[in-house]
Amino acid sequence: MRTQVGIIGAGPAGLLLSHLLYLQGIESIIIENRTREEIEGTIRAGVLEQGTVDLMNQMGVGARMMKEGHFHEGFELRFNGRGHRINVHELTGGKYVTVYAQHEVIKDLVAARLQTGGQIHFNVGDVSLHDVDTSSPKIRFRPNKDGELQEIECDFIAGCDGFRGPSRPAIPQSVRKEYQKVYPFSWLGILVEAPPSAHELIYANHERGFALVSTRSPQIQRLYLQVDAQDHIDNWSDDRIWSELHARLETRDGFKLLEGPIFQKGIVSMRSFVCDPMQHGRLFLAGDAAHIVPPTGAKGLNLAAADVQVLARGLEAYYKAGKMEILNRCTEICLRRIWKAERFSWFMTTMLHRDQGHTPFERGIQLAELDYVTSSRAASTSLAENYIGLPMEF
């Protein structure tokens, strides 16, 4: 097989990139180690920045998102038994965030690629990258996990295959520098058959730990609890989960948490990670292959969307004008924004979670930070600007 851009991974990064390239007349082939049913059926939350929503609409894949998504003009920070609303819409000149699950984004993008003749090979195995530092890099894989080995010859490879995929290790260790922080806590997330308990997201800092109230649909709400990093889901009965949520979300004004049957629950680890550089030869990384953020800042999918916008623009300049300038600067352009998103995600995580190693002094600093960002317009504006998504800067 021969194509212009070989894309490894059919997550948000790979699918967005493929469709952006299609709109510019650039060919691509996507390979993915999971089945279509797996990637479309893995339920994951999604809080989309204004820029990501705008991108999907500009690409012509945003119709269902605009119909079914929940548009939030703010969010609440809750501590010391009181809620404090951050009016993002007002503080950012009319912008908002959209709650639309990641797997729904994937469904829309897969449908768009297939409807326009895009090639996606699902359920592949033994993926490997070759000759990435030449002008003709190659991807090898086995169809249906154990079929006969096939090869895609490309001009460029986009590694959109997540944190554990084969793309990042294809950058030599002598070239690659990795930055990482692993947090001493995790999130226990549940999906509940109950209407949302609030119209906007609630981020709660409590003596017992962090809690988050989110939404999935008018009939389903998503809730999270901070738990120990070594904890196991078997330790958490439904009754224990509800008891802890009620305790951490309690307010002096009688907030009511709506209960219902829990039909999904699991524990998600928390880490921050950055790979530098995000490119080597004709290989470019995007999304979780290049960086991970804790979910507190809701930046994962949005960073992937930003990465592929830069890469798509660089590839467009190469194929239409023979220019390599943007491609050569991809790492520089992307990492400038990524590090700011990493900072914001770390800031939100450390401000909202209880670390068992904290002294009373550090607890006092944490509460002072919360008080400051909710009482100072300047601090609230900074928070809102980061939450809504920083601009792309080339």
From Swiss-Prot:
Record-listed E.C. numbers? 1.14.13.33
Q: Does the keyword NADP apply?
A: yes
Gene3D superfamilies referenced in this protein's UniProt entry, alphabetically: D-Amino Acid Oxidase, subunit A, domain 2, FAD/NAD(P)-binding domain
Q: Where does FAD bind?
A: E32, T42, I43, R44, A45, G46, V47, Q102, D288, L301, N302
Which residues are listed under the site Important for catalytic activity?
Y203, Y387
List positions binding substrate: Y203, S214, T215, R216, Y224, P295
InterPro entries per record: FAD-bd, FAD/NAD-bd_sf, HB_mOase, RIFMO-like
Pfam families membership? FAD_binding_3
What reaction does this catalyse? Answer: 4-hydroxybenzoate + NADH + O2 + H(+) = 3,4-dihydroxybenzoate + NAD(+) + H2O; 4-hydroxybenzoate + NADPH + O2 + H(+) = 3,4-dihydroxybenzoate + NADP(+) + H2O
Required co-factor? FAD
One GO molecular function term of this record is:
4-hydroxybenzoate 3-monooxygenase [NAD(P)H] activity
Q: How is the co-factor bound, per the entry?
A: Binds 1 FAD per subunit.
Q: Does the keyword Oxidoreductase apply?
A: yes
Q: Which GO terms describe its biological process?
A: benzoate catabolic process
- Alphabetical keyword list: Aromatic hydrocarbons catabolism, FAD, Flavoprotein, Monooxygenase, NAD, NADP, Oxidoreductase
Q: Which PANTHER family match?
A: P-HYDROXYBENZOATE HYDROXYLASE, TRK SYSTEM POTASSIUM UPTAKE PROTEIN
Described by its record, this protein's role is as follows: Involved in the degradation of 4-hydroxybenzoate (4HB) via the protocatechuate (PCA) 2,3-cleavage pathway. Catalyzes the conversion of 4HB into 2-hydroxypenta-2,4-dienoate (HPD). It is highly specific for 4-hydroxybenzoate, and is able to utilize both NADH and NADPH as electron donors at approximately equal rates.
* UniProt family annotation: Belongs to the aromatic-ring hydroxylase family.
Record-given protein name: 4-hydroxybenzoate 3-monooxygenase (NAD(P)H)
* Natural source organism: Paenibacillus sp
> Which gene underlies this protein?
praI
